[in-house]
Amino acid sequence: MQILLANPRGFCAGVDRAISIVENALAIYGAPIYVRHEVVHNRYVVDSLRERGAIFIEQISEVPDGAILIFSAHGVSQAVRNEAKSRDLTVFDATCPLVTKVHMEVARASRRGEESILIGHAGHPEVEGTMGQYSNPEGGMYLVESPDDVWKLTVKNEEKLSFMTQTTLSVDDTSDVIDALRKRFPKIVGPRKDDICYATTNRQEAVRALAEQAEVVLVVGSKNSSNSNRLAELAQRMGKRAFLIDDATDIQEEWVKEAKCVGVTAGASAPDILVQNVVARLQQLGGGEAIPLEGREENIVFEVPKELRVDIREVD
């Protein structure tokens, strides 16, 4: 059995930054550190940080006065931000800068009283945070997930209308929704630069290349990870058997025992150690040396807040 590795795969710059913020805060301030929502959607990462003293909460009311609070990489609404400001808390923001970019687009539309449409998945924390940047009652903020949603949508003023997208969507699906928006509302204005982030786009491109060669595709990522789910869906659409797994223990031998080529990739919130463990398990099942495919090089780095820029070795 041949093992192929998608490239790029795994951690993106926003996830790296968010995890570093929690790790550095723990090193500097000590446990406990409170984090609103899972800092990134990966069980291994969250469990590791929890063992070191991070406490993951959903409501600001769960955080005691005087504590350290970190917002997750997915971002928060203005209401959550204001609630935290009203408390005696030290707050650090791990929102991915590419999510913050979308927040700024929504806030700008809100200030102008222009209606905005967000393409995204209802209930996802990034969507809740982005929708929560809009506050102008003279305008309006709407969520759509599919072309059908677009055709059912009515707005107050089609002349002043903009759209944004969640950063972790399927590129192909989003293109279909944008096409519907432009047909339904010919004067709608989109972002100057695509809101779907570079890491989402690159990983979907990489899994497409992987699925062209592999019979079975294993996507390392947690079930609540939007970008990881999109990778598995894309491979399935290409006619391949694709499975979303948290780690190597999820692999079922019957998935791969007849396969001549198995592809492995990882969502943007999955650490490489999990990929290494998956490769090791596949090798136990008869796989050869893992061969990385060529792909786009990623060298983007997002800095942590200056108060947390410290070499953890100096703190230990």
From Swiss-Prot:
It catalyses: isopentenyl diphosphate + 2 oxidized [2Fe-2S]-[ferredoxin] + H2O = (2E)-4-hydroxy-3-methylbut-2-enyl diphosphate + 2 reduced [2Fe-2S]-[ferredoxin] + 2 H(+); dimethylallyl diphosphate + 2 oxidized [2Fe-2S]-[ferredoxin] + H2O = (2E)-4-hydroxy-3-methylbut-2-enyl diphosphate + 2 reduced [2Fe-2S]-[ferredoxin] + 2 H(+). Pfam families: LYTB. GO terms for biological process: dimethylallyl diphosphate biosynthetic process; isopentenyl diphosphate biosynthetic process, methylerythritol 4-phosphate pathway; terpenoid biosynthetic process. CDD domains: lytB_ispH (cd13944). [4Fe-4S] cluster binds at C12, C96, C197. The keyword Magnesium does not apply. Keywords: 4Fe-4S, Iron, Iron-sulfur, Isoprene biosynthesis, Metal-binding, Oxidoreductase. One of its GO terms (molecular function) is metal ion binding. Pathway: Isoprenoid biosynthesis; dimethylallyl diphosphate biosynthesis; dimethylallyl diphosphate from (2E)-4-hydroxy-3-methylbutenyl diphosphate: step 1/1; Isoprenoid biosynthesis; isopentenyl diphosphate biosynthesis via DXP pathway; isopentenyl diphosphate from 1-deoxy-D-xylulose 5-phosphate: step 6/6. The active site is at E126. (2E)-4-hydroxy-3-methylbut-2-enyl diphosphate binds at H41, H74, H124, T167, S225, S226, N227, S269. Its cofactor is [4Fe-4S] cluster. InterPro entries: LytB/IspH. Binds 1 [4Fe-4S] cluster per subunit. It is an enzyme of class 1 (oxidoreductase). Belongs to the IspH family. Homodimer. PANTHER family: 4-HYDROXY-3-METHYLBUT-2-ENYL DIPHOSPHATE REDUCTASE (PTHR30426:SF0). Catalyzes the conversion of 1-hydroxy-2-methyl-2-(E)-butenyl 4-diphosphate (HMBPP) into a mixture of isopentenyl diphosphate (IPP) and dimethylallyl diphosphate (DMAPP). Acts in the terminal step of the DOXP/MEP pathway for isoprenoid precursor biosynthesis. This is 4-hydroxy-3-methylbut-2-enyl diphosphate reductase. It comes from Escherichia coli O1:K1 / APEC. The lineage of its organism: Bacteria, Pseudomonadati, Pseudomonadota, Gammaproteobacteria, Enterobacterales.
